[in-house]
Amino acid sequence: MRVLFVYKEKNGDNLFVPVIRTRLSVHGIEAISSVDEFWNPSRSYDIIHIHWPEEVVGWNVNDVDIDKRLETRLRYFKEKGSRVYYTCHNLSPHYGSPLHQACYRVVERMADCMVHLGNYSLGKMAGLYPDCRHVLIPHPIYLGAYDDTLTREAAREYWGIDRRTFVVTAFGKFRRRDEVWMTLKAFFSLPRRKKLLLAPRMLPGSYPKPLLSVIRCLLHLLGVRTENNERIISDEDLPYYFAVSDVVFIQRCVILNSGVVPMAFLFG
């Protein structure tokens, strides 16, 4: 069996797809990650698996006919005998682009099988697309993807954090203003005298650099270490954020799931 994950693997990106691809390979399934292979295939595939429609069409797409092109391409694969799988990470794109919205609907409509990470999307999407097969598969815990043997002491030495400091980490990218306010309110309400919030991707990247610097400095005085939300966290640094933490705070308000939850379990 040959599976195409329509996804471009990049350093510092979410390892969700690479982890699954590696595990499939262990079981003798040929699994490939590529966006180019979707638009210009060099071979046939038994399964075309889409995780994020934005990965397929581009995160900054401006082609008004992109949804039609996407449907044509999916129809091409289905006519060749491929089955279309879709993992429902989000019900809608994070930033609400009408072009991306249209592509989400195309993928949902064309999917032969929809994989859900939780019961909420399964119940909702099964009602909307009853002819599609719907399965629930829990989020993987990234086993083997990172060094999970780090001690808290080693991580604190790495970040230069005193062992008596209570550390809260809000790791994921902040996409909404209410996520920022919820996190800061929770942190400042914490009844600890010596505390630190690590939120490496909290500040909007659209802010001018001088303003970002001022905000970052002010927050630092209040015990918050943060950067802009476009920052890429290296695979080498990632384990240290979790190993150093007393609490991993999940700042999601409306998003279906967060990979930070299983990642936190990986690091204990």
Each predicted region: which residue ranges?
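Acidic donor-binding loop of glycosyltransferase active sites
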Residues: 239-257, 266
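Short donor-sugar binding/catalytic loops of nucleotide-sugar-dependent glycosyltransferases
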Residues: 171-175, 202-204, 254-255
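Conserved donor-binding/catalytic core segment of Leloir-type glycosyltransferases
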Residues: 161-178, 187, 197
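Donor nucleotide-sugar binding/catalytic pocket of nucleotide-sugar-dependent glycosyltransferases
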Residues: 112-126, 130-147
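A short helix/loop element that forms part of the nucleotide-sugar donor recognition site in Leloir-type
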Residues: 146-161
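Membrane-proximal helix-turn-helix segments that form the acceptor-binding/catalytic region
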Residues: 68-82, 97-114
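Nucleotide-activated donor-binding/catalytic signature segment of Leloir-type glycosyltransferases, i.e.
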Residues: 209-244
